[in-house]
Amino acid sequence: MTATRGFTLLEILLVLVLVSASAVAVIATFPVSVKDEAKISAQSFYQRLLLLNEEAILSGQDFGVRIDVDTRRLTFLQLTADKGWQKWQNDKMTNQTTLKEGLQLDFELGGGAWQKDDRLFNPGSLFDEEMFADEKKEQKQEPAPQLFVLSSGEVTPFTLSIFPKGQEPDEQWRVTAQENGTLRLLAPGESDEE
């Protein structure tokens, strides 16, 4: 009987498993580009806003989002009857997100009602708010949000652009809410006209 030379199927499969495992380990260590970070951040904000909109409709509560362009921070808020605007307490989602260092935000409220060109009155209260202040309620209240997600399904019209620092406007990922409450995620170069 002659002995055959060569590798068994088991040996070949073992080598393939080792090569594929090492390839996965190497690919996982590759850095993510800033353009990919912009895409991931825009998709994350869009999905969170959809979740917030659904939660508002189902629970009957009003929510808001505070956007700080300078610090690249997005804060999700909930309106409570006794404390006013507070950070949204949810086990499955963080209530505050800070974007990566290489990204930049551009935020613009939409709709004619939000523009300040044709105001009849100066913004602010007509009454002395200190007169009605309750000294017992000196609890820390979050600043009011710029975006409102109401239990009626309404969303403040806006455009939030997320892009790498120093890039042209055609590299922007945009999340928009239109006058009719439709939320859209727009890739770079994509137009929001349907």
Curated annotation (Swiss-Prot):
Post-translation changes: Cleaved by prepilin peptidase.
Membrane-spanning ranges: 12-32
Gene Ontology cellular component annotations, sorted alphabetically: plasma membrane; type II protein secretion system complex
Pro-sequence residue ranges: 1-6
Quaternary structure and partners: Type II secretion is composed of four main components: the outer membrane complex, the inner membrane complex, the cytoplasmic secretion ATPase and the periplasm-spanning pseudopilus. Interacts with core component EpsG.
Mode of membrane association: Single-pass membrane protein
Entry keywords, A to Z: Cell inner membrane, Cell membrane, Membrane, Methylation, Protein transport, Transmembrane, Transmembrane helix, Transport
Pfam families hit by this protein: GspH (PF12019)
Entry-annotated residues carrying N-methylphenylalanine: 7
GO biological process, one term: protein secretion by the type II secretion system
PROSITE patterns: PROKAR_NTER_METHYL (PS00409)
Location of the protein in the cell: Cell inner membrane
Keyword Membrane carried by entry: yes
Protein's UniProt name: Type II secretion system protein H
Similarity-based family: Belongs to the GSP H family.
Free-text function comment from the UniProt entry: Component of the type II secretion system required for the energy-dependent secretion of extracellular factors such as proteases and toxins from the periplasm. Part of the pseudopilus tip complex that is critical for the recognition and binding of secretion substrates.
This protein's record includes keyword Acyltransferase: no
InterPro entries for this protein: N_methyl_site, Pilin-like, T2SS_GspH, T2SS_protein-GspH, T2SS_protein_J, TypeII_GspH
